[in-house]
């Protein structure tokens, strides 16, 4: 549907439904029962507006039709000030949000309302958050790599264009900086934009991310249209309805950039577990029978409805990076287990690498990708990646021996492996554009071909004479060679 047709339909619906009023008959926390006149029941997922005693409009979403002209809805904000008998207006359509370039550099709530105190968003287009996944005939079926310009990711755990990537890592290991660098690189290298969905995480973290994005230039305060990201927040202090739907709000914004602007989009969801958790809360509030470990019986369906919309089409792509919280480190828990079924790659951040000062602290042995197989990547890429992993794995096995007996007790062959593995480990570090203000080192975007060439030179022994420190925080291999020459001169 064209944007002009969509707007006309929205106006018609708004006029047609303006007299479709119901009455609130029960309020239990964020769940409301509303009765409507005969023949005027709203559809499931329709948005309903209710005016509370403070003259503020509260938006609810219809979840169940109960019979006897009653519906059960879940509020998207707190229900303070609401009372029985309050008038409820059926909008005749799902929650609709502003989309387009006007959303860049702004922060929105689940309803698409700006919450950054920078004034209203004047957008020509609005889209409902509930939309079908692209048809099979519209999908891009040939798998291709989404180049990020980050060596460790592109070489050892490459991302699929239109794929889903799980991001695992504790506090303080560099998740935020990695996310910001990806946002920066997708804008520069692919002419794309990013959408960040903060689902059920801490408000402080959301604020910190926003401030860091402004400092690093990802959000351009002077001209918001030059910003590279739109942000949607439904934080952990908000009702479960908001946390359950804010992921769809972010996804809808991303879909517009893909389908209408025909761009490559990065969609970040932090945290996908909180999406499931919010769905579980809503399910319990609606009185559904719980499933395994107390989760909602519709867990697989809800996750599938979200994930199936994240894909590559013939027009553009949405590549999604999802932070995954694993409750009690139990990978068999239904929430992470359901998420894993949809992932194409995993990026695991290691505290041990961060402690060594190697950033990005991506664990080269724990991170995986379904793209790293012959037939999808080139033979040279596949062989290089396998050899790098083998060398690092052998180094890991030798570390106990080195700690007890020392390096001198190793065979000549093992000493060579250790020397090259240390160079590889250092070379996997990389200066980031968004960290320039902190490190004083200019950021580097490294193409996949340059990454393969560099690691091949280390593996073949061409740079055995260069000290390992020269490989730390450089981009291409040539920079390491130049760095070593400068050290020699000084």
Curated annotation (Swiss-Prot):
Disulfide bonds: none annotated. Its EC number is 7.1.2.2. ATP binds at residues 169-176. The keyword Isomerase does not apply. GO terms for cellular component: chloroplast thylakoid membrane; mitochondrion; proton-transporting ATP synthase complex. The keyword Cell cycle does not apply. GO terms for biological process: proton motive force-driven mitochondrial ATP synthesis. F-type ATPases have 2 components, CF(1) - the catalytic core - and CF(0) - the membrane proton channel. CF(1) has five subunits: alpha(3), beta(3), gamma(1), delta(1), epsilon(1). CF(0) has four main subunits: a(1), b(1), b'(1) and c(9-12). This is ATP synthase subunit beta, chloroplastic. It comes from Cyanidium caldarium.
């Amino acid at each position: 549907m064209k944007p002009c047709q969509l707007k006309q339909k929205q106006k018609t619906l708004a006029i047609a439904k303006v007299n479709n009023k119901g009455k609130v008959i029960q309020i239990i926390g964020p769940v409301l029962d509303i009765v409507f006149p005969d023949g005027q029941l709203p559809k499931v997922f329709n948005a309903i507006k209710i005016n509370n005693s403070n003259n503020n409009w509260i938006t609810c979403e219809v979840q169940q039709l109960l019979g006897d002209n009653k519906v059960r809805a879940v509020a998207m904000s707190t229900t303070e000030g609401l009372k029985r008998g309050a008038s409820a207006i059926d909008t005749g359509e799902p929650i609709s949000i502003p989309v387009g370039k006007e959303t860049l550099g702004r922060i929105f709530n689940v309803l698409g309302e700006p919450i950054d105190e920078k004034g209203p968003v004047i957008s020509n287009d609005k889209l409902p958050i509930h939309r079908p996944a692209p048809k099979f005939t519209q999908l891009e079926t040939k798998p291709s790599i989404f180049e990020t310009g980050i060596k460790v990711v592109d070489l050892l755990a490459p991302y699929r264009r239109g794929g889903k990537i799980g991001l695992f890592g504790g506090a303080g290991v560099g998740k935020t900086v990695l996310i910001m660098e990806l946002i920066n690189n997708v804008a520069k290298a692919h002419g794309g934009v990013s959408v960040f969905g903060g689902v059920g995480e801490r408000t402080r973290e959301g604020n910190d991310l926003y401030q860091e994005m402004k400092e690093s230039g990802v959000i351009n305060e002077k001209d918001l249209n030059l910003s590279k990201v739109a942000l949607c927040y439904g934080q952990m202090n908000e009702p479960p309805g908001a946390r359950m739907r804010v992921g769809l709000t972010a996804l809808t914004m991303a879909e517009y950039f893909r389908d209408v602007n025909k761009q490559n989009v990065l969609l970040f969801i932090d945290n996908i577990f909180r999406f499931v958790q919010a769905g579980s809360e809503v399910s319990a509030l609606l009185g559904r029978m719980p499933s395994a470990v107390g989760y909602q019986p519709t867990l697989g369906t809800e996750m599938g409805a979200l994930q199936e919309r994240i894909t590559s089409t013939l027009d553009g792509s949405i590549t999604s990076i999802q932070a995954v919280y694993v409750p009690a480190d139990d990978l068999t828990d239904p929430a992470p287990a359901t998420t894993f079924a949809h992932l194409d790659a995993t990026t695991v951040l290691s505290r041990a690498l961060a402690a060594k000062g190697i950033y990005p602290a991506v664990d080269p042995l724990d991170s995986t990708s379904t793209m790293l197989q012959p037939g999808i990547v080139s033979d040279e890429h596949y062989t290089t990646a396998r050899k790098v992993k083998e060398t690092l794995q052998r180094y890991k096995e030798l570390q106990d021996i080195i700690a007890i007996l020392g390096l001198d007790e190793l065979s000549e062959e093992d000493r060579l492996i250790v020397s090259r593995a240390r160079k590889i480990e250092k070379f996997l570090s990389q200066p980031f554009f968004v960290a320039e203000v902190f490190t004083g080192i200019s950021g580097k975007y490294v193409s996949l071909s340059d990454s393969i060439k560099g690691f091949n030179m280390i593996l073949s022994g061409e740079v055995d004479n260069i000290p390992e420190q020269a490989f730390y925080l450089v981009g291409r291999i040539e920079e390491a060679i130049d760095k070593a020459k400068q050290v020699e001169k000084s």
